[in-house]
Protein backbone atom coordinates (compact mmCIF):
# COMPACT_ATOMS: atom_id res chain seq x y z
CA UNK A 1 0.00 0.00 0.00
CA UNK A 2 1.15 3.52 -0.77
CA UNK A 3 1.84 5.81 2.19
CA UNK A 4 -0.25 8.95 2.61
CA UNK A 5 -0.57 11.75 5.13
CA UNK A 6 -4.01 12.58 6.56
CA UNK A 7 -4.60 15.75 8.56
CA UNK A 8 -6.63 14.56 11.55
CA UNK A 9 -8.22 17.12 13.86
CA UNK A 10 -10.48 14.66 15.66
CA UNK A 11 -13.60 16.14 14.10
CA UNK A 12 -16.28 14.63 11.91
CA UNK A 13 -14.75 15.62 8.57
CA UNK A 14 -11.19 14.54 9.22
CA UNK A 15 -12.31 11.20 10.69
CA UNK A 16 -14.26 10.57 7.49
CA UNK A 17 -11.27 11.49 5.33
CA UNK A 18 -9.04 9.10 7.28
CA UNK A 19 -11.50 6.28 6.63
CA UNK A 20 -11.68 7.22 2.94
CA UNK A 21 -7.89 7.15 2.59
CA UNK A 22 -7.83 3.66 4.07
CA UNK A 23 -10.69 2.51 1.83
CA UNK A 24 -8.82 3.78 -1.23
CA UNK A 25 -5.92 1.48 -0.43
CA UNK A 26 -3.50 3.91 1.17
CA UNK A 27 -1.49 3.26 4.32
CA UNK A 28 -2.22 6.56 6.07
CA UNK A 29 -0.16 8.27 8.72
CA UNK A 30 -2.23 10.75 10.72
CA UNK A 31 -1.01 14.22 11.64
CA UNK A 32 -2.70 16.22 14.40
CA UNK A 33 -1.82 19.69 15.70
CA UNK A 34 -1.79 21.05 19.21
CA UNK A 35 -1.77 24.72 18.23
CA UNK A 36 -3.15 26.41 21.32
CA UNK A 37 -6.76 25.89 20.33
CA UNK A 38 -9.37 26.42 23.04
CA UNK A 39 -11.08 23.21 21.92
CA UNK A 40 -8.08 21.04 22.86
CA UNK A 41 -10.45 18.13 23.59
CA UNK A 42 -10.15 17.47 19.85
CA UNK A 43 -6.63 16.13 20.46
CA UNK A 44 -8.05 13.31 22.57
CA UNK A 45 -10.71 12.76 19.94
CA UNK A 46 -8.02 12.46 17.25
CA UNK A 47 -6.25 9.84 19.34
CA UNK A 48 -9.50 7.89 19.69
CA UNK A 49 -10.24 8.08 15.96
CA UNK A 50 -6.73 7.00 14.98
CA UNK A 51 -6.92 4.04 17.36
CA UNK A 52 -10.40 3.03 16.19
CA UNK A 53 -9.30 3.06 12.54
CA UNK A 54 -6.13 1.10 13.25
CA UNK A 55 -3.65 3.86 12.42
CA UNK A 56 -0.20 2.85 13.58
CA UNK A 57 1.57 6.13 12.85
CA UNK A 58 -0.16 9.09 14.48
CA UNK A 59 1.96 12.17 15.13
CA UNK A 60 0.96 15.20 17.20
CA UNK A 61 2.84 18.38 16.29
CA UNK A 62 3.07 21.32 18.68
CA UNK A 63 2.79 24.78 17.12
CA UNK A 64 1.57 27.60 19.36
CA UNK A 65 -0.54 29.95 17.24
CA UNK A 66 -1.56 31.84 20.38
CA UNK A 67 1.57 33.95 19.91
CA UNK A 68 -0.28 35.64 17.04
CA UNK A 69 -3.87 35.39 18.26
CA UNK A 70 -6.36 36.97 15.90
CA UNK A 71 -8.93 34.18 16.19
CA UNK A 72 -11.64 33.14 18.61
CA UNK A 73 -10.01 29.70 18.66
CA UNK A 74 -6.60 30.92 19.86
CA UNK A 75 -7.39 34.02 21.93
CA UNK A 76 -10.00 35.51 24.26
CA UNK A 77 -12.31 36.56 21.42
CA UNK A 78 -15.78 35.11 22.05
CA UNK A 79 -16.89 32.21 19.85
CA UNK A 80 -20.04 33.28 17.96
CA UNK A 81 -23.17 31.36 18.95
CA UNK A 82 -26.59 30.96 17.40
CA UNK A 83 -29.64 28.72 17.27
CA UNK A 84 -29.88 25.69 15.01
CA UNK A 85 -32.53 27.24 12.76
CA UNK A 86 -30.56 30.49 12.28
CA UNK A 87 -28.50 30.96 9.14
CA UNK A 88 -24.75 31.17 9.63
CA UNK A 89 -23.76 34.79 8.87
CA UNK A 90 -22.00 35.51 5.58
CA UNK A 91 -18.36 36.53 5.55
CA UNK A 92 -15.28 35.18 7.26
CA UNK A 93 -16.02 34.57 10.96
CA UNK A 94 -13.75 35.29 13.93
CA UNK A 95 -13.16 31.54 14.29
CA UNK A 96 -10.92 31.74 11.22
CA UNK A 97 -7.35 31.05 12.34
CA UNK A 98 -4.96 33.12 10.18
CA UNK A 99 -3.12 30.89 7.67
CA UNK A 100 -3.96 27.73 9.65
CA UNK A 101 -4.46 25.40 6.69
CA UNK A 102 -1.34 26.74 4.99
CA UNK A 103 0.70 26.08 8.12
CA UNK A 104 -0.74 22.61 8.63
CA UNK A 105 -0.45 21.57 5.00
CA UNK A 106 3.17 22.73 5.06
CA UNK A 107 3.86 20.44 8.01
CA UNK A 108 2.06 17.63 6.17
CA UNK A 109 4.22 18.31 3.13
CA UNK A 110 7.40 17.95 5.18
CA UNK A 111 6.07 14.75 6.78
CA UNK A 112 5.19 13.38 3.34
CA UNK A 113 8.72 13.97 2.08
CA UNK A 114 10.19 12.15 5.07
CA UNK A 115 7.86 9.17 4.63
CA UNK A 116 8.20 9.09 0.87
CA UNK A 117 4.49 9.80 0.46
CA UNK A 118 3.10 11.52 -2.64
CA UNK A 119 -0.44 11.95 -1.30
CA UNK A 120 -1.91 14.24 1.36
CA UNK A 121 -5.56 14.07 2.43
CA UNK A 122 -7.38 16.98 4.05
CA UNK A 123 -11.04 17.34 5.02
CA UNK A 124 -11.79 20.79 3.64
CA UNK A 125 -15.33 21.40 2.46
CA UNK A 126 -16.79 24.21 0.35
CA UNK A 127 -20.51 23.41 0.75
CA UNK A 128 -21.51 23.21 4.44
CA UNK A 129 -18.73 25.31 5.94
CA UNK A 130 -18.05 28.58 7.75
CA UNK A 131 -16.63 30.53 4.81
CA UNK A 132 -12.92 30.08 5.51
CA UNK A 133 -10.81 31.16 2.50
CA UNK A 134 -8.38 28.25 2.92
CA UNK A 135 -11.13 25.68 2.36
CA UNK A 136 -11.81 26.65 -1.25
CA UNK A 137 -10.84 24.49 -4.27
CA UNK A 138 -8.75 27.33 -5.74
CA UNK A 139 -6.69 27.48 -2.57
CA UNK A 140 -6.03 23.73 -2.60
CA UNK A 141 -4.99 23.85 -6.27
CA UNK A 142 -2.62 26.73 -5.53
CA UNK A 143 -1.05 24.94 -2.57
CA UNK A 144 -0.59 21.77 -4.61
CA UNK A 145 1.11 23.76 -7.37
CA UNK A 146 3.42 25.38 -4.82
CA UNK A 147 4.23 22.01 -3.24
CA UNK A 148 5.29 20.63 -6.59
CA UNK A 149 7.72 23.51 -7.02
CA UNK A 150 9.07 23.62 -3.48
CA UNK A 151 10.06 20.06 -2.58
CA UNK A 152 13.02 17.83 -3.33
CA UNK A 153 10.67 14.94 -4.08
CA UNK A 154 8.77 16.91 -6.72
CA UNK A 155 11.93 18.27 -8.36
CA UNK A 156 13.17 14.68 -8.60
CA UNK A 157 9.98 13.55 -10.32
CA UNK A 158 7.50 12.51 -7.61
CA UNK A 159 4.39 14.63 -8.07
CA UNK A 160 2.46 15.38 -4.89
CA UNK A 161 -1.35 15.31 -4.85
CA UNK A 162 -3.61 17.02 -2.30
CA UNK A 163 -6.79 14.94 -1.95
CA UNK A 164 -10.00 16.70 -0.86
CA UNK A 165 -12.67 13.97 -1.01
CA UNK A 166 -15.24 16.04 0.91
CA UNK A 167 -14.88 19.30 -0.99
CA UNK A 168 -18.24 19.13 -2.83
CA UNK A 169 -20.29 17.10 -0.32
CA UNK A 170 -22.97 18.32 2.05
CA UNK A 171 -22.48 17.51 5.71
CA UNK A 172 -25.22 14.89 5.49
CA UNK A 173 -23.46 13.21 2.57
CA UNK A 174 -20.18 13.23 4.49
CA UNK A 175 -21.84 11.52 7.44
CA UNK A 176 -23.44 8.87 5.24
CA UNK A 177 -20.10 8.19 3.55
CA UNK A 178 -18.35 7.85 6.88
CA UNK A 179 -20.97 5.51 8.30
CA UNK A 180 -20.64 3.32 5.21
CA UNK A 181 -16.92 3.07 6.03
CA UNK A 182 -17.46 2.29 9.70
CA UNK A 183 -16.64 5.68 11.25
CA UNK A 184 -17.82 5.97 14.86
CA UNK A 185 -18.91 9.60 15.13
CA UNK A 186 -19.54 9.28 18.86
CA UNK A 187 -15.78 9.50 19.44
CA UNK A 188 -15.26 12.63 17.31
CA UNK A 189 -15.23 16.20 18.62
CA UNK A 190 -16.44 19.08 16.46
CA UNK A 191 -17.29 21.91 18.87
CA UNK A 192 -15.30 25.16 18.93
CA UNK A 193 -16.24 25.95 22.53
CA UNK A 194 -16.73 22.70 24.48
CA UNK A 195 -17.21 22.44 28.23
CA UNK A 196 -14.20 21.42 30.35
CA UNK A 197 -15.45 17.83 30.36
CA UNK A 198 -15.72 17.76 26.57
CA UNK A 199 -19.44 18.29 25.98
CA UNK A 200 -20.29 20.19 22.79
CA UNK A 201 -21.92 23.61 23.19
CA UNK A 202 -24.51 22.99 20.47
CA UNK A 203 -24.52 26.64 19.35
CA UNK A 204 -21.22 27.46 17.62
CA UNK A 205 -21.08 27.32 13.82
CA UNK A 206 -19.31 23.97 13.90
CA UNK A 207 -21.92 22.36 16.17
CA UNK A 208 -24.78 23.77 14.11
CA UNK A 209 -23.33 22.47 10.84
CA UNK A 210 -22.82 19.06 12.43
CA UNK A 211 -26.36 18.92 13.84
CA UNK A 212 -27.83 19.98 10.50
CA UNK A 213 -25.78 17.28 8.80
CA UNK A 214 -27.13 14.55 11.03
CA UNK A 215 -30.65 15.89 10.51
CA UNK A 216 -30.08 15.81 6.74
CA UNK A 217 -28.87 12.22 7.03
CA UNK A 218 -31.97 11.35 9.08
CA UNK A 219 -29.92 10.33 12.09
CA UNK A 220 -29.42 11.35 15.70
CA UNK A 221 -26.05 12.89 16.48
CA UNK A 222 -24.25 10.60 18.96
CA UNK A 223 -22.21 13.50 20.38
CA UNK A 224 -22.92 14.66 23.93
CA UNK A 225 -24.19 18.24 24.11
CA UNK A 226 -24.24 20.60 27.08
CA UNK A 227 -27.51 22.15 25.89
From Swiss-Prot:
Gene3D superfamilies: HUPs. Belongs to the QueC family. Pfam families: QueC. ATP binds at residues 8-18. Its EC number is 6.3.4.20. Zn(2+) binds at residues 191, 201, 204, 207. GO terms for molecular function: ATP binding; ligase activity, forming carbon-nitrogen bonds; zinc ion binding. It comes from Paramagnetospirillum magneticum (strain ATCC 700264 / AMB-1). Its cofactor is Zn(2+). Keywords: ATP-binding, Ligase, Metal-binding, Nucleotide-binding, Queuosine biosynthesis, Zinc. InterPro entries: QueC, Rossmann-like_a/b/a_fold. It catalyses: 7-carboxy-7-deazaguanine + NH4(+) + ATP = 7-cyano-7-deazaguanine + ADP + phosphate + H2O + H(+). This is 7-cyano-7-deazaguanine synthase. The keyword Ion transport does not apply. The keyword Ribonucleoprotein does not apply. GO terms for biological process: queuosine biosynthetic process. Catalyzes the ATP-dependent conversion of 7-carboxy-7-deazaguanine (CDG) to 7-cyano-7-deazaguanine (preQ(0)). Binds 1 zinc ion per subunit. Pathway: Purine metabolism; 7-cyano-7-deazaguanine biosynthesis. It comes from the Bacteria.
Amino acid sequence: MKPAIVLLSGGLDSATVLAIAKAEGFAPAALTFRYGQRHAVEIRAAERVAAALGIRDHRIADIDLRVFGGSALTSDIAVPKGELDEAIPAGIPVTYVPARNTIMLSFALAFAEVLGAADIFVGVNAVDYSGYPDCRPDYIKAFEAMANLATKAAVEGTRLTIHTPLIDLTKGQIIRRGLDLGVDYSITSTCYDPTPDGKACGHCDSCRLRLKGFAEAGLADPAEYAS
